[in-house]
């Protein structure tokens, strides 16, 4: 099942390992996730339902108290947190398309886990900022924070791989506005 979800690769006579993911694959996944989430916010005009905000707050609190031994839960919480924005639309096909990208977030997280403590530490404040923007119910503010959230990840991936935008075939000005 994990192989079908794209999380692990099986090599005959060698066993299973976490799938390697290229920058281009990560870029594509984050491009799509960001645009789906921005679209969800725009569909509701930024009016995030109270129950969605409550769920996001609960997930954020769990994320806040993670330690290095619980690193594997970080990306599960991240996916749950962001899924709130998609699920609030009630659009099943949108949710299915968004959810199909979860593996990329998980694999990217595991492949770049050189400093798990630093990764855990930065997750709370960036998700707190997103939650606060959602609480404002200001559509453009929420979309800006979402864009910054995903662009921060893209720029961090580039830096960690010793790359710049010039090293990619993509423009990093890709989010819908």
Predicted features and spans:
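Amphipathic coiled-coil alpha-helices
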Residues: 36, 59, 66, 70, ...
């Amino acid at each position: 099942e994990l192989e079908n979800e794209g999380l692990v690769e099986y090599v005959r006579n060698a066993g299973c390992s976490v799938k390697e993911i290229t920058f281009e694959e990560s870029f594509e996944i984050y491009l799509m996730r960001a645009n789906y989430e921005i679209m969800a916010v725009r569909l509701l005009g930024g009016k995030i339902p109270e129950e969605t905000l409550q769920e996001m707050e609960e997930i954020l609190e769990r994320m806040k108290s993670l330690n290095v031994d619980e690193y594997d839960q970080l990306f599960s919480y991240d996916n749950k947190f962001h899924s709130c924005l998609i699920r609030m639309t009630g659009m099943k096909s949108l949710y299915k398309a968004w959810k199909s990208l979860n593996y990329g977030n998980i694999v990217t997280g595991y492949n770049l886990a050189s400093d798990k403590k630093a990764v855990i530490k930065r997750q709370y404040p960036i998700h707190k900022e997103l939650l606060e923007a959602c609480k404002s119910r200001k559509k453009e503010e929420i979309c800006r924070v979402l864009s910054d959230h995903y662009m921060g990840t893209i720029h961090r991936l580039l830096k960690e791989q010793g790359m710049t935008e010039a090293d990619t075939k993509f423009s990093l000005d890709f989010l819908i506005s």
